[in-house]
């Protein structure tokens, strides 16, 4: 993989300024050829005189068992794979301190081009190109007050020209209280106290299926299937099928996140980190599954319609202690609690409130409520009809489902949220380590 990198220090012009440029070309090729044979298997038997004779068990004759043996090596090729990637970036960095002030800035521009030699379809066989510009600007006063601004200005080939570029800024502030002069009297007990807050945006262009690479272009198959004409359909012609309709409005999936954090150190051995966050994802790509068939559409319709929220807290507790020159103890515990909720969902106006998924967890399961088992066939005949013909498709001893809407039959109208979300809301992890000069106990 050839790579070129150039570093230039520009302190002579502007103190603290430096430039870096790097580019590389990576090519990957793989193929496999195998030569093998199928062995013959023999069975030994003795005649009346005690002489042994061998008989081939898999020679392909009548009564042969297993894979037929071969006397030669066959030749087999696997699928070949060829990929290439071109990558380049340029970085301008500035760091300068004057008095108690420290300022920093970094700007990065990058381009990337990748190509697959055996993509499998037309759209994936085209070169994949992305560009991006990102930056970071920071200010630090006496290691007490810290402000930071980050941004990403990225371009994606997947969207139309007016939707292609996305700007995603992020702001952050932190206050290191333990570095204040008034904090000195309690530093032996509270060795560290820092609060921080961030608020920012992020974008995701890896949405939908890989086959739907260019949402703003129609995908038309000019040779979908053959249709016959004439006597006995003896004359055939290829037909045209639409696999995707062009959509100029599909764009980046966006997320907005706010974080509040606390860093607390006690006795220089114990450290507690607490982070509380809230994230809202919008423009989530979703299939429009509730479009009437009378519109005559042949391909599925997708749009940036859905919206979801997640929030939670992350807690980390670390303990590090040295006993003398040889003993050492370390402990770490983490706890995460997170919940999610659907805010906007592409669904029709139901009469039954229980059918809506808005307000439920992103991993909430929906289904039928199983009340109990039918006592006997008589109860089957006197209960709401469910999934077939009573007394024939289900009998006494089968599961009895609840008629939620009371219409006398079990249908999709009776599906409700059941059980807990499939994604755990709480997780914990604990580790410890005790080390002596000769032993390590975990």
Predicted stretch roles:
Residues 430-436:
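Conserved small/polar residues in nucleotide/adenosyl-binding loops
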Residues 23-31, 109-117, 151-157, 177-179, ...:
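Transmembrane beta-strands of outer-membrane beta-barrel pores
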Residues 1-89, 102-104, 110-128, 291-303, ...:
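Surface-exposed, low-complexity loop segments enriched in small/polar and acidic residues
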Residues 9-19, 32-34, 97-103, 144, ...:
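Short loop/turn motifs that connect adjacent beta-strands in outer-membrane beta-barrel proteins
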Residues 36, 217-218, 224-225, 303-309, ...:
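Conserved small-residue
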Residues 1-35, 74-97, 104, 126-141, ...:
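Outer-membrane beta-barrel transmembrane strands
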Residues 118, 184-254, 271-308:
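Solvent-exposed loop/turn elements at secondary-structure boundaries
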Residues 1-8, 68-72, 77-79, 90-93, ...:
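Outer-membrane beta-barrel transmembrane strand signature
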């Amino acid at each position: 993989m050839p790579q070129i990198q150039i570093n230039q220090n520009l302190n002579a012009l502007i103190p603290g300024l430096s430039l870096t440029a790097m580019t590389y070309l990576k090519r990957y090729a793989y193929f496999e050829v195998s030569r093998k044979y199928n062995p013959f298997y023999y069975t030994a038997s003795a005649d009346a005189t005690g002489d042994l004779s061998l008989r081939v068990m898999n020679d392909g004759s009548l009564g042969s068992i297993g894979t037929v043996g071969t006397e030669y090596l066959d030749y087999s090729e696997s699928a070949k794979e060829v990929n290439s990637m071109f990558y380049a970036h340029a970085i301008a960095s500035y760091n300068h301190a004057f008095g108690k002030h420290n300022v920093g800035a970094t700007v990065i521009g990058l381009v990337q081009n990748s190509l697959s030699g055996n993509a499998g379809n037309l759209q994936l066989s085209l070169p994949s190109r992305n560009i991006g510009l990102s930056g970071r600007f920071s200010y630090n006063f006496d290691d007490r007050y810290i402000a930071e601004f980050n941004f990403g200005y990225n371009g994606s080939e997947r969207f139309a020209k007016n939707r292609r570029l996305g700007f995603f800024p992020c702001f952050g502030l932190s206050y290191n209280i333990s570095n204040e002069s008034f904090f000195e009297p309690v530093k032996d007990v509270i060795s560290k106290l820092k609060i921080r807050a961030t608020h920012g945006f992020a974008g995701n262009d890896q949405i939908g299926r890989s086959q739907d690479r260019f949402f703003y272009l129609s995908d038309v198959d000019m040779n979908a299937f053959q249709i016959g004409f004439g006597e006995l359909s003896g004359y055939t012609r290829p037909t045209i099928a639409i696999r995707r309709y062009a959509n100029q409005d599909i764009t980046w999936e966006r997320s907005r996140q706010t974080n509040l954090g606390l860093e607390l150190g006690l006795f220089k051995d114990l450290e507690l980190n607490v982070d509380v966050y809230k994230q809202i994802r919008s423009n989530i790509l979703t299939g429009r599954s509730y479009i009437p068939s009378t519109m005559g559409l042949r391909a599925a319709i997708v749009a940036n319609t859905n919206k979801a929220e997640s929030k939670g807290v992350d807690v980390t507790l670390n303990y590090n202690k040295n006993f003398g020159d040889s003993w050492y103890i370390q402990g770490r515990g983490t706890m995460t609690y997170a919940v999610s909720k659907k805010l906007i969902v592409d669904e029709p106006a139901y009469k039954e409130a229980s059918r809506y998924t808005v307000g439920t967890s992103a991993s909430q399961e929906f289904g039928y409520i199983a009340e109990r088992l039918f006592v006997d066939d008589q109860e089957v005949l006197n209960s709401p009809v469910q999934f077939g013909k009573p007394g024939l498709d289900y009998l006494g001893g089968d599961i009895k489902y609840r008629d939620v809407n009371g219409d006398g039959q079990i249908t999709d109208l009776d599906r409700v949220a059941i059980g807990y979300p499939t994604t755990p809301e709480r997780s914990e992890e604990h580790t410890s380590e005790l080390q002596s000069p000769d032993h390590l106990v975990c």
